[in-house]
Amino acid sequence: MRFLLFFLSLGLFSAGQAAMARPWLYVSTFAYAGTGEECLDNAADALREEGFTRDFEVKRFKGKSRNAGGHVDGKLRNYPVVAKIECDQSLGVTGLAVTGIDNELTYEKYSVLYDKSW
């Protein structure tokens, strides 16, 4: 009887596959004519206003292109959602990426940031 219970429990718990959690990713790029510093400052404000304050970082490009931009990224305090805004004055573009496990929350945060200006 003990072996039967063992094999029954083994069959119940090993038959299914592990749950696969796949993140959602939303990305956009925009033309940008301002300076790299303006973009970084405004991007930092936009992310903070939307709650991306955990592991918050502003990183400027190194070397001669330091004033040409960099990136700002952060995570929501209590949810697994990450946002990143990159500013590149030399290319005249800025990029936005938001990723997370919860599609509704990820898209909501992406939409709000998409509508902001930095």
Regions found by a protein language model. Give the residues of each.
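Bacterial N-terminal signal peptides
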Residues: L5-S14
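Terminal, regulation- and interaction-focused segments at domain boundaries
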Residues: A19-D55
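C-terminal partner/receptor-binding element of secreted or periplasmic proteins
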Residues: D102-W118
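Short, surface-exposed coil-to-beta transition loops
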Residues: L25-V27, R77-A83, E108
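Amphipathic N-proximal alpha-helical interface segments
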Residues: K75-G95
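Extracytoplasmic/periplasmic, Sec-exported soluble proteins
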Residues: A31-C39, K75, V98-T106
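A cross-family detector of function-defining hotspots
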Residues: E50-R77
